[in-house]
Amino acid sequence: MINSLCGSSNSLKEKCLQPNSSNQTNTHSKKNATNSCGDLEQINVLTPQSLNLPSLKFDLDGDVEVQSPDSSMWEAFFNDHLDNDFMISSPIRNINPNSPQASTYNNCNYNYAQGMQIQSLSGCSPPRFASQIGSLNSNNQQKGKGLSPLHRVFNSPNNQYMQHVENLSLPAIEEFLEDFQGDVDHFSSTKVSSECFDMETPISTILDSLTMQNSSSYGASVNEESTLLHGGNSSSQISQESDIYHQMGSMASASLSQALQQERYQEKHQKMQAQQQSLTVPIQIGIEQEQDSGLQLVHLLLACAEAVAKGEYMLARRYLHQLNRVVTPLGDSMQRVASCFTESLSARLAATLTTKSSSTKKLAPSSLSSSSSSSCLSTFPSNPMEVLKIYQIVYQACPYIKFAHFTANQAIFEAFEAEERVHVIDLDILQGYQWPAFMQALAARPGGAPFLRITGVGPCIESVRETGRCLTELAHSLRIPFEFHPVGEQLEDLKPHMFNRRVGEALAVNTVNRLHRVPGNHLGNLLSMIRDQAPNIVTLVEQEASHNGPYFLGRFLEALHYYSAIFDSLDATFPVESAPRAKVEQYIFAPEIRNIVACEGEERIERHERLEKWRKIMEGKGFKGVPLSPNAVTQSRILLGLYSCDGYRLTEDKGCLLLGWQDRAIIAASAWRC
């Protein structure tokens, strides 16, 4: 997910990441369990220049222009908002954790948790992210923002779509489509263009049109307007027009100009009455209208996906035409996520029609590489620093990345207790941002730090070497005996000798949001090779989602439910019209959605699996689960306490930890041994 594309920034030049002058003058001193958070902050300033990221609350460069080739509206939107509302809900709370226990071991864990808490506020940790499902139980009730309309649709007791994932029994979609086509009069004043969103309608107009079905602001009563919009039959409309003329009395015999004047006056009067009445309407009615419009979007999306799956391409194009008229990437979370899925369905349909023969319904990999896949890659800024800043937005605003790194680090730290020589194999090292907090914790261990060796794996050997140089500088400043070994290979091409295993070393293998990208025919061999290395601990963090099913329609529904939760959490974190949030959605999550929906075969690399599936895979290869410790749970709760949003939920599942938003898990962390 995020970490897969963050590596595209390669190594960052030191001149781009200048540290504070105080960073150069501080030296390391050992910390005991009685240190306060203020004392522990001194540890973090030891980060070398290459790893010391700018302040988390940075301002994006004014001369950097980020433009998506998919729609020209992004340029104007970003220019208007870029400097206004960045990171408004970033973690700012001061947490006073419980006092450390008396034992030196627990003191180390306490010290470690404190160090990582401070690091989460200082910004020297990584831009690597995992996206992700499942019910979460929590005694915490939601205190902040409620569910978005789309997420509320999925949680509605009337929702029938989650009951049959692969065998969907859709409602009368044809009738529903006719209802939409009955709104032509409303959209006739809208100029339709060939842009990506197929219209030039203001966002407020689109939002009004979605709720028009249950709105009373356009005259008479709710029932009368519903009849006008959805009756579709000319006789009922003529009858209602006759009633209007009958109520006006003298209009029938008046001249045409007088009739028009009277009609306009009556419409204005009815609108004023409706607006006055709307002030007394309970809030629940607005929620129901919002939910109903969300249900309409879900119906259209699922109907379009079903048409694509069945090869009914003309019908699919009709649905896409309707969707493009009512979705927008700048609306509420429901409309924004629907916009991403609409664009993805369009990409899949276009690629299919381009390469489809009369008997083939499956996408050809060659067509995808020139259409949907290239589209995913082309949306990212070419400036590596701009890409890094976008990932920093996610890293600070949401706890998902911190949770992944801190939970994995805690498990490795505990597995290395009392070891004098330790070796960590990171299967996706990137810029190495996971390891500064871990190295600080080792440096604070009673009796001194052990000898640490890190083997970093990545596709670009030069980038991995640069990461090793940065980590070596940090280890030197912390006075940790350190060695870095770079490996520039894809995971499926790894060989045992590349790990350079040594006798007497305690070994940990770390994989954060990486194994789901390994092709299925290579995953078993990779896990067997890791097992043969006899590691003390294997940390596995992955998205809690099932995007690798055999049926397109099931994957589509799962992704729609999953990413609606992601967009909901972003909605609760950022302001309503937030340029940083729009960047995160367009440059990170939209490409993921396109890959899941539009790609097939080797081009589909986002093959997320649920925790239960990973359990079967790991146990099938001879691994046994290691329950995450209470320290890891406490640490995660401290982390969530740093965020102002109350929608995040933490739950335990057979020794594993899952972090989610509301009732949907997003990311799952587990630990394993041979």
UniProtKB/Swiss-Prot annotation:
Chief place where the protein resides: nucleus
Localization terms from the record: Nucleus; Cytoplasm
Q: What happens when the gene is disrupted?
A: No visible phenotype under normal growth conditions. Unable to be colonized by mycorrhizal fungi, with a defect in hyphopodia formation on the surface of the root. Ineffective symbiosis with arbuscular mycorrhiza (AM) fungi (e.g. Rhizophagus irregularis) leading to rare colonizations characterized by malformed arbuscules reduced to trunk with a few initial thick hyphal branches. Impaired induction of AM-related genes (e.g. AMT2;4, AMT2;5, EXO70I, STR, RAM2, LEC5, PT4, VPY, BCP1, SCP1 and RAD1) in the presence of AM-fungi.
Task: Quote the PROSITE patterns the UniProt record gives.
Answer: GRAS
Region (SAW) residue ranges read 598-673
Q: Which domain of life is it from?
A: Eukaryota
Checking Pfam families in the record gives: GRAS (PF03514)
- Report the GO molecular function annotations: DNA-binding transcription factor activity; sequence-specific DNA binding
Q: Give GO terms for biological process.
A: arbuscular mycorrhizal association; detection of phosphate ion; regulation of DNA-templated transcription; regulation of transcription by RNA polymerase II; response to nutrient; response to symbiotic fungus
Q: Specify where the region named PFYRE lies, as residue ranges.
A: 507-595
Which UniProt keywords are listed? Cytoplasm, Nucleus, Transcription, Transcription regulation
Induction (free text): Induced in roots during colonization by arbuscular mycorrhizal (AM) fungi (e.g. Glomus versiforme). Regulated by DELLA1 during mycorrhizal symbiosis.
Which InterPro entries does the UniProt entry name for this protein?
TF_GRAS
The region called Leucine repeat II (LRII) is annotated at: 466-497
Region feature Leucine repeat I (LRI), mapped onto this chain: 295-372
Domain called GRAS: residue spans: 288-673
Looking at the UniProt record for this protein, which Gene Ontology cellular component terms does it annotate, in alphabetical order? Answer: cytoplasm; nucleus
Complexes and interactors: Forms homodimer in nucleus and cytoplasm. Interacts with NSP2, RAD1 and TF80.
Query: What is the official name of this protein in its record?
Result: GRAS family protein RAM1
Which taxonomic lineage is given here? Eukaryota, Viridiplantae, Streptophyta, Embryophyta, Tracheophyta
